[in-house]
Amino acid sequence: MSADDLILHYFEDIKEGQSASLAKTISESDIYLFAGLSMDTNPAHVNEDYAQTTVFKTRIAHGMLSAGFISAVLGTRLPGPGAIYVNQSLKFKAPVRIGDTVTATVTVTGLVPEKKFVTFRTTCTVAGKVVIEGEATVMVPARG
């Protein structure tokens, strides 16, 4: 992603119902990189032999790896650069596996003009199935 890919929406430009998305296919490298950065080396993510003994029968991606794509949408698409996270709730509904394409979507559900806060419904899906759902509140830059 380059600076040319960034989209900035000022608070005054945002409307209820507005949405934005991005998608990423999860690779084995993504899981190992996230494990290293987050220090979450749970064998359910990084050890296939162990993962085969779990309910999932194979390694799964870290839930927060997929949830991070919500942050990417908020920081680069809607509202975009300058957006500051205030709150995020998440419910993890299904696992994400290597090779799955995760689509993160944010949809504006409310505006608080006096604080320049925007609330969003947040979801991550794989093949149309919701794997993460939640709500975010973001402080958004205003014009001038």
Curated annotation (Swiss-Prot):
Give the GO biological process terms: fatty acid biosynthetic process; poly(3-hydroxyalkanoate) biosynthetic process; protein homotetramerization
- Boundaries of each MaoC-like domain copy? 13-128
Q: Which residues form a coiled coil?
A: none
Which Gene Ontology terms cover its molecular function? Answer: (3R)-hydroxyacyl-[acyl-carrier-protein] dehydratase activity; hydro-lyase activity
Keyword Lipid metabolism (UniProt): yes
Q: Which UniProt keywords apply?
A: Fatty acid metabolism, Lipid metabolism, Lyase
| One Pfam family recorded for the sequence | MaoC_dehydratas
Top EC class per UniProt? lyase
Question: What Enzyme Commission number(s) apply to this enzyme?
Answer: 4.2.1.119
Reaction(s) catalysed (UniProt annotation): a (3R)-3-hydroxyacyl-CoA = a (2E)-enoyl-CoA + H2O
Cystine crosslinks: none
Q: Which domain of life is it from?
A: Bacteria
Q: How does it assemble?
A: Homotetramer.
- Biological role: Catalyzes the hydration of trans-2-enoyl-CoAs with a chain-length of 4-6 carbon atoms, forming the corresponding (3R)-3-hydroxyacyl-CoAs, which can then be utilized for the production of polyhydroxyalkanoates (PHA) polymers. Cannot use trans-2,3-octenoyl-CoA as substrate.
Q: Which PANTHER family match?
A: HYDROXYACYL-THIOESTER DEHYDRATASE TYPE 2, MITOCHONDRIAL, HYDROXYACYL-THIOESTER DEHYDRATASE TYPE 2, MITOCHONDRIAL-RELATED
Q: What is this protein called?
A: (R)-specific enoyl-CoA hydratase
